[in-house]
Amino acid sequence: MSGRKPGTTGDTIVNLGLTAAILLCWLVLHAFTLWLLDAAAHPLLAVLCLAGLTWLSVGLFIIAHDAMHGSVVPGRPRANAAIGQLALWLYAGFSWPKLIAKHMTHHRHAGTDNDPDFGHGGPVRWYGSFVSTYFGWREGLLLPVIVTTYALILGDRWMYVIFWPVPAVLASIQIFVFGTWLPHRPGHDDFPDRHNARSTGIGDPLSLLTCFHFGGYHHEHHLHPHVPWWRLPRTRKTGGRA
């Protein structure tokens, strides 16, 4: 697997397999928590479900992110757009056209005032700016409707609807800290090049758990944006050859 070049049939199979696994795991755990979980009787299980959904929600966003770069199904822009929009809908009802436009701007102007992901001040202020960039009036109108509809369908279990928005919010914090703030914050140390991005240098297990390698290998991502998340560690080990 490590000897293939990105975009080969083998890589596409791996991309689609991992994408399907993340989507399926999220859907199964989402359905379980909303319809079957007894949080009062099993509080530890409820916490584990929340943690699992948070990590899988990060995974949904990463699927959409890779789709933006055309790396889920290389050479198939419509397939990437469909998969990316599905992942964003499940994550928080976000708009694919809006996010892909802003993300491409981020890559062109990373770490500058023209970067929609870049912010000034401390991490809390920067996070607020980061969220407001992607969470607009459309999401502000759509999400309450979805949550209310969910609550009505759940009936007596209406409180379990929190297992959709809460993991999404926690995931956004996780994505921001490990995928934006740590890699792009100025003044911490010198950036290696014009991409104004650094890799956090944490080990591969933590890199996977925190942000599907987009923190641990963020500079590598800016150097090789079409490399899918699971191949990012390979780019460093091979000196840039994915």
Curated annotation (Swiss-Prot):
<dbReference type="Pfam" id="PF00487">
    <property type="entry name" value="FA_desaturase"/>
</dbReference>
<dbReference type="GO" id="GO:0016117">
    <property type="term" value="P:carotenoid biosynthetic process"/>
</dbReference>
<dbReference type="GO" id="GO:0016491">
    <property type="term" value="F:oxidoreductase activity"/>
</dbReference>
<keyword id="KW-0125">Carotenoid biosynthesis</keyword>
<dbReference type="InterPro" id="IPR005804">
    <property type="entry name" value="FA_desaturase_dom"/>
</dbReference>
<comment type="function">
    <text>Converts beta-carotene to canthaxanthin via echinenone.</text>
</comment>
<protein>
    <recommendedName>
        <fullName>Beta-carotene ketolase</fullName>
        <ecNumber>1.14.99.63</ecNumber>
    </recommendedName>
</protein>
<comment type="pathway">
    <text>Carotenoid biosynthesis; astaxanthin biosynthesis.</text>
</comment>
<keyword id="KW-0560">Oxidoreductase</keyword>
